[in-house]
Amino acid sequence: MSLPTEVETYVLSIVPSGPLKDEVAQGLEGVFAGKNTDLEVLLEWLKTRPILSPLTKGILGFVFTLTVPGERGLQRRRFVQNALNGNGDPNNMDKAVKLYGKLKREITFHGAKEVALSYSAGALASCMGLIYNRMGTVTTEVAFGLVCATCEQIADSQHRSHRQMVTTTNPLIRHENRMVLVSTTAKAMEQMAGSSEQAAEAMEVASQARQMIQAMRTIGIHPSCGAGLKDDLLENLQAYQKRMGVQMQRFK
């Protein structure tokens, strides 16, 4: 597997499924192919994307800045800096400095990734911040090793959280999680609908989902009735899925 392919794989693992994921994939492919050469345009596009978490935007901004040739001298963007500050935790910064010292001695992607995997995602993000803010320099391969280690830590955490939620035996938690997921998806649909041909339909489906969740929370539906929520909303959400390509399998 080539280095760009490996980096793209790890980065996309932390991007939510849906049309936006395909946009991000195309952006990464263009950058690695040398087609997207205007870093300012790329970063402005990234900044305005809905749904992506600040940390995911920070990681993508870091990758774009590393990859676009001749653009390292440009002014750093605040939204990337803020995302890569380790949540302002001094412990993360202390660990990031120690990690940076180790990474300076590494020369390969896999060596850097192996070293970085022993640190938390917060410390890894802080270390990326050091490099992004020009407070330290490493080779591009080493920086990509750091990126992939960070994405692996985040993806592992998301997987553990999802698995724990799915396997919990508490019906109240499962029921509320189902409603939260539907509500979150409705919000995502509304954010994506703006420029799509199916905007009106997407907004209507999202509105129906929100109204149903609001009603259930207001009157208090017993967890045993949760299956009805799945049946009613999945029918609408899957109709939208077929048109827009948004993956809804997490509701099954």
From Swiss-Prot:
Keywords in alphabetical order: Host nucleus, Membrane, RNA-binding, Viral matrix protein, Virion
Segments of this protein annotated with the region Membrane-binding: 1-164
Subcellular locations according to the entry: Virion membrane; Host nucleus
GO molecular-function term, one example from the UniProt record: structural constituent of virion
Keyword presence, RNA-binding: yes
InterPro entries assigned: Flu_matrix_M1, Flu_matrix_M1_C, Flu_matrix_M1_N, Flu_matrix_M1_N_sub1, Flu_matrix_M1_N_sub2, INFV_M1
Membrane topology summary: Peripheral membrane protein
Tagged with keyword Glycosyltransferase: no
Disulfide cysteine pairs (residue numbers): none
Region annotation (RNP-binding) ranges: 165-252
Example of a GO biological process term: viral budding from plasma membrane
Residue ranges annotated as motif Nuclear localization signal: 101-105
Pfam families noted in UniProt: Flu_M1, Flu_M1_C
UniProt similarity note: Belongs to the influenza viruses Matrix protein M1 family.
Assembly mode: Homodimer and homomultimer. Interacts with NEP. Binds ribonucleocapsid by both interacting with genomic RNA and NP protein. May interact with HA and NA. Cannot bind NP without genomic RNA.
Note from the entry: Most abundant protein in virion. When expressed alone can form virus-like particles in transfected cells.
Entries under HAMAP family matching the protein: INFV_M1
Function per UniProt: Plays critical roles in virus replication, from virus entry and uncoating to assembly and budding of the virus particle. M1 binding to ribonucleocapsids (RNPs) in nucleus seems to inhibit viral transcription. Interaction of viral NEP with M1-RNP is thought to promote nuclear export of the complex, which is targeted to the virion assembly site at the apical plasma membrane in polarized epithelial cells. Interactions with NA and HA may bring M1, a non-raft-associated protein, into lipid rafts. Forms a continuous shell on the inner side of the lipid bilayer in virion, where it binds the RNP. Determines the virion's shape: spherical or filamentous. Clinical isolates of influenza are characterized by the presence of significant proportion of filamentous virions, whereas after multiple passage on eggs or cell culture, virions have only spherical morphology. Filamentous virions are thought to be important to infect neighboring cells, and spherical virions more suited to spread through aerosol between hosts organisms.
Protein name: Matrix protein 1
Organism annotation: Influenza A virus (strain A/Swine/Iowa/15/1930 H1N1)
Lineage: Viruses, Riboviria, Orthornavirae, Negarnaviricota, Polyploviricotina
GN (gene name): M
